[in-house]
Each structure stands twice: as C-alpha cells, then as structure tokens.
A protein has these predicted regions:
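Acidic, carboxylate-rich catalytic segments that either coordinate divalent cations
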Residues: 235
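Mg2+/Mn2+-dependent nuclease catalytic core
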Residues: 122-230
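Residue-level signal for secondary-structure boundary elements
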Residues: 101, 229-232
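Metal-dependent nuclease catalytic cores that hydrolyze phosphodiester bonds in DNA/RNA
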Residues: 1-135
C-alpha cells in the first residue's frame, strides 16, 4: 500500500489523487467507501461536541465562535484518541496472529474464531490489488475464503453484535473477497471493546448478502471513478 509518499521537499506526506494518477495507484476499499456519508459516525461526532459544550464552561466575555471552536476541538481530540486506541488494538491482534504476542485482545478474537472456524490457518494484514481498479489491506483471512475485519467500539458489554453491523461493514468484506477472487466467501465482523480490550463480539454475515454487498460496492467504485475522473483499471 502507498498510503504516504515522499514529497518534492523530501518529507513524507499523505498520498493524494494527483499522486495516484501520476503513479498509477489504485484507491483502497476504505477510500471508496468513504465517498458515502456515515450517519452513525456523524451522529457520534455531534453527540461528543454537545457533551463537550455541557462540560466546558463558556467564559463570561468569550465570543460564541470561540466557544464553539473549543467544543469542536474537544470533540476532535476525543475522536483522535479513539482512533489511536483502535490502531493500537489492531496492532496487538495482528501481532498475535503473527505469533509475536499473546495479548488479551488477540486471545479474545482467537477464541471466537476457533469456536466457529476451527483448524484454520490465518493470514494477517495481507494486501491485494484487483484488476477492477482497487486494492486494500485485509485485517485477517484464510486461504479457504474466510474474511475477517476488526472494529473497535466503546461499551460492548451485553450488546448484540448483529445490531452493531451496517451494510458498509459487509461491503468492505465483500470487496476484499472479490478482490482476492472468492465468489462465495464467509465474512466476519469482529468488534473489540476499546476499554475492556479482552471483550470481543463477532458477527458472521449470511452468505446471501454477499451478492448484494458486492453490487453495492461495485456501484460505489464506479461512482468514485466518475467523480474523481480516474480509472486505474484502464491503465
């Protein structure tokens, strides 16, 4: 994956669409999915900003604009902290499946997978590039066609994993499977609690929804190519 590139000034920076067109790079599955609004995520951001407005006190002479900015900054800091914790947990699970660590997040995920898919050989954080013009890095999969994606979330205790998933989660897994040449994959979304990191809940997607999710993703991929005026599959 080419998430970053060395710029003209010799410093590393995020890869842009202009870089992709110049170098013949493909968008990731996540990049394609990000073209669609995520109401649940936006609602979470709004809630955090509102919570910040309650906790923070507006100065007597503080203009509304400055107070709003402080609330937005507090919300952004919370989001960045949650993302950082998610990245840390992902790394721990990856190291576990690579045989480099026996941490509790890995054990919780492995316990769920062993229960439903015993005796599988798992491959962690592997990349692919599809001739359809997209690519990605898969959290975990097996050569038998089981694709697993990890998400981190707060307050998982007592939750029903079936109520935690959205179509975008299924689309992501289906896009990975399609990119790796699997027509009838098994797809699994695993949620790990950000605080209680030994708590993992898994949802196994029904096979029938794979066709729908592939079509949904491919429609978004076509839309992305048209909006960005870039189709790497024709290069």
């Amino acid at each position: 994956p080419a998430y970053t590139i060395i710029g003209a000034n010799g410093k590393e920076r995020n890869t842009t669409l202009r870089d992709a067109k110049k170098e013949g790079l493909v968008p990731s599955v996540t990049t394609v999915l990000n073209i669609v609004a995520k109401p649940s995520l936006e609602n979470w951001k709004i809630n955090k900003a509102l919570e910040a407005s309650i906790e923070l006190q507006q100065g007597e002479d503080e203009p509304n604009e400055e107070f709003i900015y402080r609330c937005k900054t507090a919300q952004r800091d919370i989001g960045q902290s949650a993302a950082a914790q998610g990245t840390k947990i992902h790394a721990l699970i990856e190291r576990g499946f690579e045989g480099k660590s026996n941490n509790k997040s890995y054990r919780a995920v492995k316990k769920f997978l062993d229960k439903h898919f015993p005796n599988e050989e798992w491959i962690a954080e592997d990349s692919f590039c599809s001739e359809l013009g997209y690519g990605g890095k898969i959290d975990l999969y097996s050569k038998s066609g089981i694709f697993v994606d990890f998400k981190t979330k707060d307050g998982l205790e007592g939750k029903d994993p079936a109520k935690l998933v959205f179509d975008e989660h299924g689309m992501q897994l289906s896009a990975y499977a399609q990119g790796c040449g699997f027509d009838s994959p098994q797809r699994v979304s695993v949620f790990v609690d950000r605080e209680q990191t030994d708590l993992a809940l898994g949802h196994i997607w029904d096979e029938d929804s794979h066709i729908k999710h592939v079509e949904m993703f491919n429609s978004l991929l076509t839309y992305w190519k048209l909006v960005k005026n870039y189709d790497s599959s024709t290069l």
